[in-house]
């Protein structure tokens, strides 16, 4: 994710676009001045949801579903300049400033990370922790939460569907009509 965001940042910078956040993981903020609204509308029309930030600025979030083709298309939509993503990828790999942010101290030093040397040993340890946990499927809460206890697991399956759970965080209201209808019905 970060690599694609870094490629996007480099491509935009080379095309003359100001990237305002120096440090980032997956989200860029760009300053387009008076062009921000027209670029926002063009990206919306192309199927990309950007965030309208401060006056003249847009936010771009890169996630697991973003591809190299998306990066090229976004740079072209925003700047009008076509880029070679592979060339930028090589440049970003060689000049990654995030290397300075990598952890250098000792990690996983707690004894639990060093005392289980087999898969079955680790599974036994995890099962022991699980058995200590108090959960609704192993106990009963005497007061309240009746609805929660009675909901069948199958009723919860839709929550895992992409159509339900993959709403883009910057999606405009016209793309969230189903969510708005569902929320309205829950308030009645």
PLM regions and their residue ranges:
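Hard-cation-handling environments
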Residues: 11, 35, 45, 66, ...
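Flexible inter-domain linker/hinge segments
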Residues: 68-142, 146-154, 159-162
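Conserved PLP-binding catalytic core of the aspartate aminotransferase-like
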Residues: 2, 15-43, 62-65
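Short beta-strand
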Residues: 18-23, 50-54, 140
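Gly-rich Lys/Arg/Thr-decorated short loops/hinges at beta-loop-alpha junctions or inter-strand turns
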Residues: 19-24, 102-103, 160-174
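Buried hydrophobic positions in well-ordered alpha/beta secondary-structure cores of metabolic enzymes
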Residues: 1, 28, 60, 144, ...
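Noncatalytic alpha-helical scaffolds and linker/capping helices
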Residues: 42-45, 53-80
């Amino acid at each position: 994710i970060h690599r694609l965001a870094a490629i996007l940042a480099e491509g935009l910078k080379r095309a003359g676009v100001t990237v305002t956040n120096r440090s980032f993981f997956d989200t860029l903020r760009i300053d387009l001045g008076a062009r921000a609204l027209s670029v926002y509308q063009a990206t919306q029309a192309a199927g990309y949801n950007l965030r309208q930030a401060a006056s003249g600025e847009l936010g771009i979030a890169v996630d697991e579903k973003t591809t190299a083709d998306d990066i090229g298309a976004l740079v072209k939509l925003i700047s009008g300049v076509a880029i070679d993503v592979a060339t930028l990828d090589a440049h970003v790999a060689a000049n990654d400033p995030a290397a300075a942010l990598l952890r250098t101290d000792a990690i996983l030093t707690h004894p639990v990370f060093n005392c289980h040397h087999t898969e079955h040993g680790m599974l036994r340890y995890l099962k022991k922790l699980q058995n200590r946990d108090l959960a609704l499927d192993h106990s009963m809460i005497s007061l309240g939460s009746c609805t929660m206890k009675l909901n069948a697991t199958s009723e919860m399956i839709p929550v895992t569907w992409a159509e339900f759970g993959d709403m883009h965080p910057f999606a405009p209201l016209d793309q969230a009509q189903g969510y708005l209808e569902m929320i309205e019905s829950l308030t009645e």
